[in-house]
Each structure stands twice: as C-alpha cells, then as structure tokens.
Regions:
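C-terminal motif of bacterial Sec signal peptides marking the signal peptidase cleavage site
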Residues: 33-35
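Bacterial signal peptide processing site
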Residues: 37-39
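Beta-loop motif signature
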Residues: 52-127
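SH3/SH3-like beta-barrel superfamily modules
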Residues: 111-153
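N-terminal secretory signal peptides that target proteins for export/translocation
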Residues: 1-18
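Exported/periplasmic cell-wall-interacting domains
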Residues: 46, 141-142, 154-163, 191-202, ...
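A structural motif detector for short, solvent-exposed N-terminal "entry" segments of globular domains
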Residues: 152-190
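Boundary regions of SH3-family modules and the immediately adjacent low-complexity/disordered segments
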Residues: 44-82, 138-166
C-alpha cells in the first residue's frame, strides 16, 4: 500500500470517522421508523391549511356554535320592495283566521278555472328554533284583501322579483323587476259606476282566452280583487289586467272594473309577471 493510502486510513480512523458512522446509523434508523408509520418531530407538523379549515389553524376551534333561537309564536314579515313570495298549493290547503283557529276556507290544487291555486305570502310565524309553523297569506276571495293562515307543508314557496303598480289617475300600468321599471303601458280603467277596486292584491291566475283576438286580447292576469259593485257577476266579478280589441279606448275610464292595456304590452307583461306577483292599485 502506498503512503497516500496509509495516510487515508489513519485519517479516517480518527474520531471523525466514528461520528460519521453514528450519523449514518441514525439516518438509517429514522428511515426504518418512518417506513413503519412513525414520524420525526419535523414530519409530525401539519402543513398550513390554505382555506382555514384545519383544526390546528382555526381560531374558532373548540368554541361552542351559536344556535339560532326565536321567540315561539313570533311573526316575521316576508318580502321587500324587490322580492316577494308566492305559495303554490300542493294538494289541498286550509286557511284559518288565526293559526289553528276558526277555519276560513279550503282550497284545492287547482282553482275553478283549472289553474294552480296560489297565495301571496305576507309573513311567517316561527317556533323557538326559527322554523316556520304558519304562513300568513292573502287569499283570492272576498272581501278584497282578506288574509288567512296556512300550514307550510301544504304549499311550495316560490320567490319572485316582479311587482306591478296600477295608477288609476295616470291611467298607467307599470312593471318592476328587482325594483327597476321595465315596462309601462297606458290603460283603460273602470267607469265611475263600475270603478276599479283600489288596494294591495296579487296575480292569482294567468289565463289565455280561446279567442286571442277577442275583448281580452292574448291573455289575462287575474288579480285577487273583485268588483265591489258587480256582485252578481260570474265568480263574484273578479278583476284582471288583460288585452283589448278596442285599443282606441286606452287611457279612458270605460271598463267594468278590469284594466285593459295594449295587446303587445300585455304579451310582455304576461311573460314576466308570474302568479303571486304583488299588484298595487292606487287612485
């Protein structure tokens, strides 16, 4: 062996060689433990959760969750100037004057004209867990504007973003969607002898006549209002917003209480205003 080889052996026979060997043994041992499912202290640290859902980084961990509570029997208004709700009867519904007291009327899935029975939802009564126990709704019956209470399981709730305003003095019908005016139409209204009833109502039925060139035009939006004069009429004299075959009379007080608008405007209104849409008729 050369001198150089001898020096190499002597050099690595020193304590440095023994330290390197011990280090290699530790590395091999750590690898073996990790392969069996163990971890070193560094490997046991969880990575940071980028969306904040990890228990190790969630500042709310361990805190009791807040449970919403309501005063049993409290009534909360539903709807705003931009949104409202309709209740569509599933099979049958019973309306009460007060929750569970004094039955007012019974309704089937379809009304007398064969279209779905719909109510306008005004408020809800809640239990202590804030669940809905009753809906206060406007009913499509006399007297005008009558309300009642129905069970939530009897109906399907439908959100709406449309609203109709009828200004009798201006002879105008306006449609709003999410609070924005999207359509305005000149209207013919009831005469002084057969006036159009004022108040807050809703679209309770959408009807397409057999003859779309007749006095009702291409369609009619029945509202939950009735003539207060023509009480002997069929179905109690219901009021509707409909088209006309006499457009030259628009802007005048010539009807029996219904609100007539141009057929083109009616077609657009009919497409947008679903059943349950609030309707305000002002003098």
């Amino acid at each position: 062996m050369s001198v150089t080889s001898t020096n190499w052996v002597k050099k690595w026979s020193r304590p440095r060689y023994r330290a390197v060997v011990r280090l290699l043994l530790l590395v091999l041992l750590a690898s073996a433990v990790a392969a069996c499912g163990g971890t070193t202290e560094a490997e046991g640290t969880l990575p940071r959760d980028p969306i904040g859902t990890s228990a190790s980084t969630n500042s709310d961990a361990g805190k009791p969750k807040k449970v919403e509570r309501c005063r049993p029997g409290s009534v909360k208004r539903m709807g705003t100037a931009r949104t409202s709700y309709a209740a569509v009867v599933r099979k049958r519904a019973i309306a009460f004057r007060q929750p569970g007291k004094s039955e007012l009327a019974r309704f089937g899935r379809l009304n007398i004209n064969g279209v779905p029975t719909v109510f306008a939802v005004l408020a809800k009564r809640v239990d202590r867990h804030c669940g809905v126990s009753w809906y206060r709704v406007q009913l499509p019956m006399k007297p005008n504007g009558i309300t009642g209470w129905i069970r939530p399981y009897a109906v399907n709730l439908v959100p709406l973003t449309t609203r109709i305003a009828v200004d009798l003095s201006a002879r105008r019908v306006t449609l709003y969607v999410r609070g924005k005016k999207v359509l305005a139409a000149r209207a013919a209204i009831g005469t002084s002898a057969t006036p159009t009833a004022t108040g807050r109502y809703y679209v309770n039925q959408r009807l397409i006549p057999g003859d779309t060139s007749g006095p009702f035009g291409p369609g009619a939006l029945g509202i939950s209002a009735f003539s207060e004069v023509l009480t002997g009429w069929t179905q109690g004299g219901p009021i509707a917003i409909h088209g006309t075959n006499r457009p030259h009379l628009l802007g005048q007080a010539v009807s029996n209480g219904c609100i007539r608008i141009h057929n083109d405007k009616l077609a657009r209104l009919f497409r947008r205003a679903l059943a349950g849409t609030p309707v305000t008729v002002s003098a």
